[in-house]
C-alpha cells in the first residue's frame, strides 16, 4: 500500500518569485489530515509554492491516541519536537521523545509515531524532491 505525498497537497496563495522573502503566521496555513494517520494532521508552512527552492518546512500535530503507522519515505527527515510526547520507532529502535528533542530519519528508513502525551507537535524539514510514502506491513 502506498500513499503519495508532497507540498502540492495543500492549497496556498500564488507563489512569489523564487528568492522573494515570505513572512506569514503559521495559523494562516490550513491543517490537512494525514490520510494514513490516526488523529494526525499536517501543515506545509513553506515550500515550492511559497518560492522556497530547496526545502519544505512542515508542522505535524497528533492528538492523544493518535499516530502514524510504520512507513518509509524516499527523502530524509529532520525533525524538532515542539510539544507533547511520543514513542517513535526508527528502523526497529524505539525512542520516547518530547519538547526540544531532534531527530534525523534517513531516506528509506522505516519509522512510526505513537502519541504518549498529546497534543504532540513537531516541525519536519524535508528536501524539495519527489517523495513517495510506503506503508510497512506488520511482521516484515
Named regions from a protein language model:
Residues 74, 93, 109-110, 118-119, ...:
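A generic "binding-loop/recognition-motif" signal
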Residues 75-86:
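Glycine- and acidic-residue-biased ligand/ion/polar-headgroup-sensing regions
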Residues 1-54, 137-140:
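A short, N-terminal "cap"/entry segment at the start of jelly-roll beta-barrel domains
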Residues 69-70, 88-89, 105, 111-117:
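Short beta-strand His + acidic residue motifs that chelate non-heme Fe in jelly-roll/DSBH
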Residues 59, 104, 118-134:
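A short hydrophobic beta-strand segment most commonly corresponding to one strand
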Residues 60, 85, 93-95:
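Well-ordered beta-strand scaffold positions
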Residues 58-73, 107:
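Conserved short histidine dyad/triad with adjacent acidic residue
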Residues 92-107:
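Short acidic-glycine-tyrosine-enriched beta hairpin
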Amino acid at each position: 500500500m502506498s500513499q503519495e505525498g508532497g507540498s502540492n497537497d495543500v492549497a496556498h496563495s500564488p507563489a512569489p518569485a523564487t528568492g522573494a522573502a515570505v513572512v506569514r503566521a503559521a495559523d494562516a496555513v490550513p491543517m490537512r489530515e494525514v490520510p494514513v494517520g490516526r488523529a494526525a494532521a499536517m501543515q506545509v508552512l513553506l515550500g515550492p509554492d511559497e518560492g522556497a527552492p530547496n526545502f519544505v518546512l512542515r508542522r505535524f500535530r497528533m492528538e492523544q491516541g493518535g499516530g502514524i503507522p510504520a512507513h518509509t519515505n524516499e527523502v530524509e527527515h529532520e525533525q524538532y519536537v515542539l510539544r507533547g510526547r511520543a514513542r517513535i520507532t526508527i528502523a526497529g529502535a524505539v525512542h520516547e521523545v518530547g519538547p526540544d528533542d531532534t531527530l534525523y530519519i534517513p531516506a528509506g528508513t522505516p519509522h512510526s509515531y505513537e502519541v504518549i502525551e498529546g497534543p504532540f507537535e513537531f516541525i519536519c524539514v524535508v528536501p524539495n524532491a519527489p517523495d513517495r510514502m510506503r506503508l510497512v506491513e506488520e511482521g516484515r
